[in-house]
């Protein structure tokens, strides 16, 4: 009897599941002009498969449905686009049927005023404020000297002259990126405050790509909780600065006093959301790119040899304590190529999201109002027509022609949403590489696993043995 009852329950579950899946497909298929695809379960869609399978999920659907298909991921019906020209047009069409369409989890955790989400006059004001903080003149006169001093000091402890040391380069670059961001943005040095901020920021990052289910134990719940704590810490920091009247040479002070060259002064809420977004975006991109650059250089000795030569040439005529300057950075052509190739091959950013404000025609299909477009840049990064032999680490490809001006160059986004921190991020990674390759030699230790979806990471760390050069 028990076995019969179990069999009935299982059969009923199968029937109900099949009916739910079928009902969901029929519900969406009534909309005319949709691209082919599947929508998965009601409410959850295909999010679980998307997050678990990642690139395999995308490739399987591309083979079945073509380069434009529909799905339901991260809480919203979505059209995935893998065609370079269609993606370029989508990114360039803000205000003409498209607005930013990031998942609810990211909007909630980074804040409703985060620069990736706001539109219109507020976006112009916040982007203007951010560009004023990271414009070339600021990098040259203020940010680069700070970055240089930080990197020199931070990397000094990675090894000793008497012996080699095994380090987890993933953990090291995460700490480095976060401390560098905190130092530049809010003047926070290593200590109890940075430790408290670090703990919450690590939790916040995990919640940004998740289903917005606010239940204890979920990444979203933990991430949103971490945001509340971060907001409280930043509010206290702002209050203390106002009461002390002391001047601080950092981005937070510039935002509080009003950034030079901007018309509008941001509210405290907007400043806090901008600070959280700055730290989040700088931390994620810089730490991952730095880690993967070390990995790729370790695997490609010829590239490492040319990179070292470039940096030792810069050190010629400098005393050991001399900093690198703007002219040194501008001369790092191969370093820039290594950074761009790392971003491309590792696919640090998998894609960009837009949302339709009206029915939009795309490639003969009609994308309904309120749907998302997932500009899937991973496939563009691996397009053999744009990047011959795309799965090979080849930084020299970036020296052959000005790839940065190519209309399908999307390593830093596109359209009016091109990453405003592109250059300062490149400066940070280049400065890290300068001191790392001129001070150390290294080799990979053990068998390290690298995952590239939904974010690039080494689940058990990426261990290298470091020795003084």
From Swiss-Prot:
CDD domains xrefs: CYP90-like (cd11043)
PROSITE patterns cross-referenced by the UniProt entry: CYTOCHROME_P450
Domain of life assignment: Eukaryota
Purpose of the protein: Catalyzes the C6-oxidation step in brassinosteroids biosynthesis. May convert 6-deoxoteasterone (6-deoxoTE) to teasterone (TE), 3-dehydro-6-deoxoteasterone (6-deoxo3DT, 6-deoxo3DHT) to 3-dehydroteasterone (3DT, 3-DHT), and 6-deoxotyphasterol (6-deoxoTY) to typhasterol (TY). Involved in the organization and elongation of the leaf and stem cells. Not able to convert 6-deoxocastasterone (6-deoxoCS) and castasterone (CS) to brassinolide (BL).
SUPFAM superfamilies: Cytochrome P450
InterPro entries according to UniProt: Cyt_P450, Cyt_P450_CS, Cyt_P450_E_grp-I, Cyt_P450_sf
UniProt induction comment: Down-regulated by brassinolide (BL) in the brassinosteroid-deficient dwarf1 (brd1) mutant.
Membrane topology listed for this record: Single-pass membrane protein
GO molecular function annotations of the record: heme binding; iron ion binding; monooxygenase activity; oxidoreductase activity, acting on paired donors, with incorporation or reduction of molecular oxygen
Result for mutant: residue 111 to V: In brd1-2; dwarf and defective in brassinosteroid biosynthesis
Co-factor requirement: heme
Gene3D superfamilies for the chain: Cytochrome P450
Keywords carried by this UniProt record: Brassinosteroid biosynthesis, Heme, Iron, Lipid biosynthesis, Lipid metabolism, Membrane, Metal-binding, Monooxygenase, Oxidoreductase, Steroid biosynthesis, Transmembrane, Transmembrane helix
Protein name per the record: Cytochrome P450 85A1
Intracellular or extracellular location(s): Membrane
Main location: membrane
Keyword Repressor assigned: no
Chemical reaction(s) catalysed: 6-deoxoteasterone + reduced [NADPH--hemoprotein reductase] + O2 = 6alpha-hydroxyteasterone + oxidized [NADPH--hemoprotein reductase] + H2O + H(+); 6alpha-hydroxytyphasterol + reduced [NADPH--hemoprotein reductase] + O2 = teasterone + oxidized [NADPH--hemoprotein reductase] + 2 H2O + H(+); 3-dehydro-6-deoxoteasterone + reduced [NADPH--hemoprotein reductase] + O2 = 3-dehydro-6alpha-hydroxyteasterone + oxidized [NADPH--hemoprotein reductase] + H2O + H(+); 3-dehydro-6alpha-hydroxyteasterone + reduced [NADPH--hemoprotein reductase] + O2 = 3-dehydroteasterone + oxidized [NADPH--hemoprotein reductase] + 2 H2O + H(+)
Annotated transmembrane regions: 1-21
Gene Ontology CC terms, in alphabetical order: membrane
EC number annotated for this UniProt entry: 1.14.14.-
Disulfide bond annotation, renumbered to this chain: none
Tissue: Expressed at low levels in all the tissues, but preferentially in the leaf sheath.
Pathway membership: Plant hormone biosynthesis; brassinosteroid biosynthesis
Family note: Belongs to the cytochrome P450 family.
Gene disruption: observed consequences: Plants show a range of abnormalities in organ development and growth, with deficiency in the elongation of the stem and leaves, skotomorphogenesis, root differentiation and reproductive growth. Treatment with exogenous brassinolide (BL) rescues the abnormal phenotype.
